[in-house]
């Protein structure tokens, strides 16, 4: 089927290309945009015949990027060689033909190219199709690796040159603080004492990378980095052989999972990032901060203010596969990983700290540690550090054994080759930290301080940060589930027959009455439903987990769909029933103390607007102020970016989040309570994604204040933390931005804000009306969405453990409202419209400007928008993110997905509305920013899109062809497999998709 081409659509698609970064015609650019398997004589040579020349070190942008071009070309040739070896020249030639035709279609909006492409794709056998999809998918993955390598390369060159510090680094943040007079030691010490910064890893239905693929890609990245070094001919040949082997391994490795990912798989996937990045890089980050402070003559003791969190194993919202057993497995596996790390590091320290007390002294505390060690070797009687470390090792082994069971972690012999002794376990991780500091202090007192720096100090820091639990696991469940559990408990206890039907005030009366009672609700011998047993079982497991691994192991309970105060109080009562809440609410003699902080999640537009009222009413309840006091006088509130976007569109979601944050800060300041905001950000801009540094700095004044948690999801986890160097910088960026957002004075004069906010409110109202008119009020839009995107196929893909829809429905009962926000956004990315990151903005701004009663007033309104862009971080960040999304949008490719809609009239009507809005949005964005080209302010990303997207487009064209076959009833397993492979490849090419 040909793509839909009304005049307007064709014009818009052409405009879309014009708005993108211009295609350069230089030979260097052609190197990159040549096929990974270019069908010419030179490309037919083996990759080894064209090893890259030494990396250029020129000053022009093109020279700086030359090594990147070489790497992409080199990896592409390697892939081409492997493709020929594995599949033959015929498939290789098909890949090249499709690539060239797709490039023509992209650059020229060539209708003849579209017809040629259609014909070629229809002629492919299912086997050929799968091979072609895999080729382009792997090229996307390899191009990502090359880009990451180049980022590391440029960062290193920058540091070696001694250039000025870059935004997003601790050094840059401290320089800004010093300039602003906000960097005195007492100020910074207070900041670190009160700060809590926590990235939280979550598993989601759109996380599509298999661990086997990630592992192979890590190897490719490492080998590619080696090529920047001066290698001998033999070393280079060996490097190339290893690279060829890994690319061959990738080609022969299944890209997709055979079965749906289990929660246990998701846990292991997350743990791989700890081994690859977090265990080493987080302690290194602390050391970097200390070093940067010292360079400015500042001294501040760093408590463990930066920690890691996780939802994996504790997030039950919409996922029936998460149970008490899952939570137990999650914390057990996390603990096993951290115990293995500690024991490995202590073992290595035993080899390194060979200090003899015949040559250097030791503190009395260190001698005591050595004296109680089980080590009896006559060869180490004068080596107190080694003996102390052997004792610490056996205590760690015992600590793991009592918490995890026999044989849970590998244990080495404890001195003289003897079997591990039954040592006394550490009571908690703090005791282990104290022992490590005994070693550090003793070395410092006896001229051995340099010996602590390489391993001992980082280990002590790791133990402070990770404890015996590695990461705090949040519990999350939907408010309606809690209500059902409470209803059953109250009914069985004879307290209230139908709690769920009560008005809100009556619900609160019942809940508060029960929380004031010392007795439990549960009857000891009564039978309860599976739901009640499962929910209470999770909370009981959380109590046991806290007892075993410390209070930090599980400390938060998030209630999704929080709409009322009772939604929060219900969880307090459930904690009481499971021993997590002690005392009685409102009783001054025995005040309630909750083990888990009850955290509301406000997601929809109405809920965000209601958030301050709910929190005000909660704090006003008798005894809640004492409960919050017990929590350190802190209260966390989570804000959801996904559902608010799906509910009201990009602009309104951002604005309502901004308003809710300001209102919450005002309320909490008034009550003298510290507010910590938890940002439920995703990978896509429509779900709060975008550069973290700018996102944090654009938060409303006073809303960060050293306290922030934020989710890391989907593909973002792999792209941010798969590479240790990039992972370290991403972690540093979060700290740097939090420092600046908390301590720097905000630049906008209060007099400007009212005008800005009034304009934003007008734009938001208009944008939401435009968005909802399309998504929720257009007859047939539901059918358009389900037919023009691979949403149904995404639901089938074995990506995550959670279903893609909140309900399982047959096609006749599908509703946009029931669809999870994450696959909703993911689907718009797949068809290259990325509608969730821009739709409605153009109409809103155009109406705002065009409704001006005079040209002078229009000019004034536009000038105000320009001022907002230049001086208001919130608005500037919003436009920057939208700019990125518009650059990634491709109307020409999207038109081919529109052609999948069976109702031609519906197809034309909806797609032309989307195209018209894209044109309006691009036009007004250019008017406000003064930049006619997309990503004019972000040339790095502009080049990335230009270099990679010609290889992404064929995947879209192939996906459309496969969707046609699948929906026409083709039952060939390779067709379904090809669709799923294309979903994977497009996600990799877009990068921020989760």
Curated annotation (Swiss-Prot):
Active-site residue numbers: 204, 646
Pfam families in the cross-refs: PEPcase (PF00311)
GO MF: magnesium ion binding; phosphoenolpyruvate carboxylase activity
GO BP field: carbon fixation; oxaloacetate metabolic process; tricarboxylic acid cycle
Cofactor(s) needed: Mg(2+)
Record EC number: 4.1.1.31
InterPro entries reported in the protein's UniProt record: PEP_COase (IPR021135), PEP_COase_bac/pln-type (IPR022805), PEP_COase_Lys_AS (IPR018129), PEPCASE_His_AS (IPR033129), Pyrv/PenolPyrv_kinase-like_dom (IPR015813)
Reaction catalysis annotation: oxaloacetate + phosphate = phosphoenolpyruvate + hydrogencarbonate
A GO cellular component entry from the record: cytosol
Recorded family membership: Belongs to the PEPCase type 1 family.
Protein name: Phosphoenolpyruvate carboxylase
């Amino acid at each position: 089927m040909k793509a839909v081409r009304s005049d307007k659509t064709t014009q818009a698609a052409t405009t879309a290309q014009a708005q993108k970064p211009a295609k350069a015609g230089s030979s260097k650019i052609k190197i990159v945009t040549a096929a990974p398997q270019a069908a010419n004589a030179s490309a037919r040579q083996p990759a080894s015949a064209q090893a890259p020349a030494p990396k250029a070190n020129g000053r022009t942008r093109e020279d700086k990027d030359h090594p990147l071009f070489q790497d992409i070309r080199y990896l592409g040739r390697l892939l081409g060689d492997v493709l020929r070896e594995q599949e033959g020249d015929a498939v290789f030639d098909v890949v090249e033909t499709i690539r060239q035709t797709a490039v023509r279609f992209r650059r020229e909006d060539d209708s003849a190219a579209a017809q040629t492409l259609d014909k070629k794709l229809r002629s492919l056998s299912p086997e050929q199709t799968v091979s072609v999809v895999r080729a382009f998918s792997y090229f996307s993955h390899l191009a990502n690796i090359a880009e990451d390598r180049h980022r590391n390369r440029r960062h290193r060159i920058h540091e070696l040159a001694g250039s000025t510090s870059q935004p997003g680094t601790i050094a840059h943040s401290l320089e800004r603080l010093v300039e602003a007079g906000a960097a005195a030691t007492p100020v910074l010490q207070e900041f670190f004492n009160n700060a809590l910064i926590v990235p939280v890893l979550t598993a989601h239905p759109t996380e599509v990378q298999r661990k086997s693929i990630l592992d192979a890609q890590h190897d490719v990245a490492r080998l590619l980095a080696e090529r920047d070094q001066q290698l001998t001919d033999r070393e280079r040949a060996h490097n190339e052989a290893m690279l060829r082997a890994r690319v061959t391994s990738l080609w022969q490795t299944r890209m997709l999972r055979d079965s749906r990912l289990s929660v246990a798989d998701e846990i292991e996937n997350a743990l791989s990032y700890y081994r690859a990045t977090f265990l080493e890089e987080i302690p290194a980050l602390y050391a970097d901060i200390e070093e940067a402070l010292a360079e400015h003559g500042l001294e501040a003791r760093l408590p463990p203010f930066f920690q890691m969190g996780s939802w994996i194993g504790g997030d039950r919202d919409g996922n029936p596969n998460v149970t008490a057993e899952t939570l137990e497995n999650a914390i057990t596996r996390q603990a096993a990983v951290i115990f293995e790390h500690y024991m490995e590091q202590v073992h290595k320290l035993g080899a390194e700290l060979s200090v003899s007390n015949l040559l250097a002294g030791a503190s009395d505390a260190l001698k005591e540690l050595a004296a109680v060690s089980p080590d009896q070797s006559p060869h180490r009687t004068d080596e107190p550090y080694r003996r102390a470390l052997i004792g610490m090792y056996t205590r760690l082994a015992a600590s793991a054994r009592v918490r995890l069971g026999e044989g849970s972690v590998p244990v080495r012999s404890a001195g003289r080759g003897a079997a591990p002794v039954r040592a006394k376990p550490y009571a908690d991780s703090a005791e282990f930290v104290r022992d490590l500091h005994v070693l550090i202090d003793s070395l410092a007192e006896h001229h051995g301080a340099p010996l602590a720096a390489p391993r001992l100090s980082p280990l002590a820091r790791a133990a402070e940060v990770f404890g015996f639990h590695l990461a705090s696991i949040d519990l999350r469940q939907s408010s309606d589930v809690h209500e059902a559990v409470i209803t059953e408990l109250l009914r069985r206890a004879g307290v209230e027959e139908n709690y769920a039907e009560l008005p809100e005030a009556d619900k609160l009366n019942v809940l508060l009455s029960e929380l004031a009672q010392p007795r439990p609700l549960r009857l000891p011998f009564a039978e309860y439903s599976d739901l009640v047993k499962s929910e209470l079982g999770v909370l009981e497991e959380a109590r046991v987990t806290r007892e075993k691994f410390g209070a930090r192991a599980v400390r938060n309970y998030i209630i999704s769909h929080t709409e009322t105060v009772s939604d929060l109080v219900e969880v307090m009562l459930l904690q009481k029933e499971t021993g997590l809440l002690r005392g009685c609410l409102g009783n001054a003699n025995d005040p309630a103390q909750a083990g888990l902080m009850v955290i509301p999640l406000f997601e929809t537009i109405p809920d965000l607007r209601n958030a301050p009222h709910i929190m005000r009413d909660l704090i006003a309840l008798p005894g809640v102020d004492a409960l919050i006091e017990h929590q350190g006088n802190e209260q966390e509130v989570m804000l959801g970016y996904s559902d608010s976007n799906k509910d009201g569109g990009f602009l309104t979601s951002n604005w309502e989040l901004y308003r809710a944050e300001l209102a919450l800060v005002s309320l909490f300041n008034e009550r003298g309570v510290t507010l910590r905001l938890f940002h439920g950000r995703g990978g896509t801009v429509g779900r709060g994604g975008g550069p973290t540094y700018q996102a944090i700095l654009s938060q409303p004044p006073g809303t960060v204040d050293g306290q922030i948690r934020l989710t890391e999801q989907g593909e973002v986890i792999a792209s941010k933390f798969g590479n240790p160097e990039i992972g370290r910088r991403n972690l540093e960026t979060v700290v740097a931005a939090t420092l600046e957002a908390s301590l720097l004075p905000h630049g906008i004069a209060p007099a400007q804000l009212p005008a800005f906010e009034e304009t934003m409110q007008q734009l938001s109202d208009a944008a939401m009306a435009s968005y909802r008119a399309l998504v929720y009020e257009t007859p047939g839009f539901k059918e358009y969405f389900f037919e023009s995107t691979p949403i149904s196929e995404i639901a089938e893909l074995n990506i995550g453990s959670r279903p893609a829809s909140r309900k399982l429905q047959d096609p006749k009962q599908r509703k946009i409202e029931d669809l999870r926000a994450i696959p909703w956004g993911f689907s718009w990315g797949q068809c290259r419209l990325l509608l969730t990151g821009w739709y409605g903005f153009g109409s809103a701004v155009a109406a705002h400007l065009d409704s001006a009663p005079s040209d002078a007033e229009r000019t004034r309104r536009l000038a105000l928008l320009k001022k907002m862009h230049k001086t208001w971080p919130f608005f500037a960040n919003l436009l920057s993110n939208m700019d990125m999304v518009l650059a990634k949008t491709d109307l020409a490719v999207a038109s081919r997905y529109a052609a999948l809609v069976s109702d031609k009239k519906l197809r034309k009507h909806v797609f032309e509305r989307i195209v018209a809005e894209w044109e309006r949005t691009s036009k007004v964005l250019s008017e406000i920013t003064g930049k006619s080209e997309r990503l004019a302010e972000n040339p790095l990303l502009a080049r990335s899109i230009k270099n990679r997207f010609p290889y992404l487009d064929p995947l879209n064209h192939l996906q459309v062809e496969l969707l046609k076959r699948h929906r026409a009833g083709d039952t060939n397993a390779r067709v379904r497999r090809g669709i799923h492979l294309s979903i994977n490849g497009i996600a990799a090419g877009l990068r921020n998709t989760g």
